[in-house]
Amino acid sequence: MTTHKDIIISGGGIAGLTAAVAFGTAGFDVLCVDPTAPVIDRSNQGADLRTTAYLQPAHAFLQQIGLWPLLAERSAPLQIMRIVDAARETLVRKDFNAADISNAPFGWNLGNWDMREGLLTRLD
């Protein structure tokens, strides 16, 4: 059996799935492959429970490919950015408030598990 695809993506993590959604949205016929079975329950071993900060350019991209409506309710706005310099004897901290430069937050924090669920929903 021969199957034609425009794009084959190796890796079904967040980056690979995001690429699959983006290329699919652009009209390409995409196949995303991964050597491991997907983790479909957040309580299973291998579930990625970390979070990622998506800044303004990423937010615009997620809007463009139709993902943001699936993710917005699960995200938390990043209103304060704290920079910490722990390399000195005395800890140095500086806070920046997004309201000082814009009406929008710096970005949004989103659980990797939530992102993965949104990606899989969008691919269905």
What label would you give each PLM region?
Residues 3, 26, 76-79:
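Short, basic and Ser/Thr-rich N-terminal targeting/leader segments
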Residues 5-32:
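N-terminal Rossmann-like FAD-binding beta1-loop-alpha1 element of flavoenzymes
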Residues 20, 59, 63, 120:
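Short glycine-/small-residue-rich flexible loop motifs, especially phosphate/cofactor-binding loops
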Residues 24-48:
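Glycine-rich FAD pyrophosphate-binding loop
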Residues 46-87:
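N-terminal FAD cofactor-binding segment of flavoenzymes
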Residues 76-124:
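Conserved N-terminal helical subregion
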Residues 44-50, 101, 105:
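Short glycine-enriched, charge-decorated loop/helix-capping segments at active-site entrances
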